[in-house]
Amino acid sequence: MNIQEEIKKRRTFAIISHPDAGKTTITEQLLYFGGEIREAGTVKGKKTGTFAKSDWMDIEKQRGISVTSSVMQFDYDGKRVNILDTPGHEDFSEDTYRTLMAVDAAVMVVDSAKGIEAQTKKLFEVVKHRGIPVFTFMNKLDRDGREPLDLLQELEEILGIASYPMNWPIGMGKAFEGLYDLYNQRLELYKGDERFASLEDGDKLFGSNPFYEQVKDDIELLNEAGNEFSEEAILAGELTPVFFGSALTNFGVQTFLETFLKFAPEPHGHKKTDGEIVDPYDKDFSGFVFKIQANMDPRHRDRIAFVRIVSGEFERGMSVNLPRTGKGAKLSNVTQFMAESRENVTNAVAGDIIGVYDTGTYQVGDTLTVGKNKFEFEPLPTFTPEIFMKVSAKNVMKQKSFHKGIEQLVQEGAVQLYKNYQTSEYMLGAVGQLQFEVFKHRMEGEYNAEVVMSPMGKKTVRWIKPEDLDERMSSSRNILAKDRFDQPVFLFENDFALRWFADKYPDVELEEKM
């Protein structure tokens, strides 16, 4: 195998959107074109019992939302495609943000009837911060939606990114006729047996259709006042190519996929803690753990560490360094994924995502290297939780299951764990309420450990250096605790309590995470 050629083939991207914009549906259609599933359109089939391929966890099937990030791989048109399907629900932003550290591009799915929504904006900010390319898919043209020009304007005004339409809708909803493909200079037809027609045939096909007349006017306006197409600006994350289509009816998706693969970047390098970039074509293997998932197969109570390969080639059985612990590990049981199905892998290269069976060796953010290389990649973002709950085992006889469940789910990063300094009570912190619900559901379903949870409300969290800590700093306005790394942390009742503390101890430095 020529490793350089293999790396060049890789296209690794995440799909981001607000809940219900159609992200899971478009994922299914892409897998359908990749030959990974026989039948697309099984998303949210609650009555029929068919569920989206990427929504594999029990609670996701019940609710019809993605709460973990799935990893799926397929080959198409000479490229090896790695899709990371991220949770659309806002409470799972932590897992999503970390996943966005492991990709080279993002596909942003927008509901054309609703435009840019809150969660899309949040996720876009992370992608923009990383400077990776964003490709936009305006979805649900099979329903009535907003004017295409308004949608482009929203991209520029709300997200602050220039846009270039690759195609343009001819009508919408019941009046939807197809797409005027500006990039390929052809018509893509929604109805009839023929899929494509030449632009010259447009007048003959659509006659005096008012929507087609409108399209011609819009395109004239875009040619005069729109942005110029620039591959350089796309790769720099400064210009987003915009595709219109309908994932549900599988219209415009294949055109999108083929054009996307043409312009999406090859695997990029990754920055070490000293600021140096590790090149994907370096011969030495390196990678980082961006996600840990327990119980992907409940029958085996397994844990998988998801690793983005940054450089070189993985070979089954290879030994790696784990600089965080100073120890080594052997990568013998490694898989690649199609949501919940998996297959053992013997080789993988930079750009690929592999799953390493984990018995508790790895943590999110770990760097893996080989040979004399002992460097670490820049740390992944960690997030300050906003709401807290006390948690304890309902049945004292189930303490062992309770502790195992908490340990594994916390290592996944699903919730954050704190321990009261004085009472040793367990407290959980989360970005949003849904995280607690998922935690409770999984503790009971996967670990057979019922839990008692009592709300503590919102807290303002700040870390303190161990050498600055004096237990007398604890008061009725704060809770002194330890995080899961045994670092001291204060949970303040509110901003007033934080300011009061800062005034009382002006020399003490308090640290805030993202």
UniProtKB/Swiss-Prot annotation:
Q: Which SUPFAM superfamilies match?
A: EF-G C-terminal domain-like, P-loop containing nucleoside triphosphate hydrolases, Translation proteins
> Which GO BP terms, alphabetically?
regulation of translational termination
Gene Ontology cellular component? Answer: cytosol
Does this UniProt record's set of keywords contain Transcription regulation? no
* tr-type G domain mapped to chain residues: 8-268
Annotated GO molecular function terms are: GTP binding; GTPase activity; translation release factor activity, codon nonspecific; translation release factor activity, codon specific
| Ribonucleoprotein recorded as keyword | no
Q: Which PROSITE patterns match?
A: G_TR_1, G_TR_2
Keywords for this protein: Cytoplasm, GTP-binding, Nucleotide-binding, Protein biosynthesis
List residues binding GTP: 17-24, 85-89, 139-142
User: Which superkingdom does the taxonomy of this entry point to?
Assistant: Bacteria
Compartmental location: Cytoplasm
Tell me which InterPro entries the record gives.
EF-G-like_DII, EFG_III/V, G_TR_CS, P-loop_NTPase, PrfC, RF3_C, RF3_dom_3_sf, RF3_GTP-bd
Question: PANTHER family given for it?
Answer: PEPTIDE CHAIN RELEASE FACTOR RF3
Regarding protein family, the annotation reads: Belongs to the TRAFAC class translation factor GTPase superfamily. Classic translation factor GTPase family. PrfC subfamily.
Described function:
Increases the formation of ribosomal termination complexes and stimulates activities of RF-1 and RF-2. It binds guanine nucleotides and has strong preference for UGA stop codons. It may interact directly with the ribosome. The stimulation of RF-1 and RF-2 is significantly reduced by GTP and GDP, but not by GMP.
Task: Please state what the protein is called.
Answer: Peptide chain release factor 3
Name the species this protein comes from: Streptococcus pneumoniae (strain Hungary19A-6)
Report the gene name.
Answer: prfC
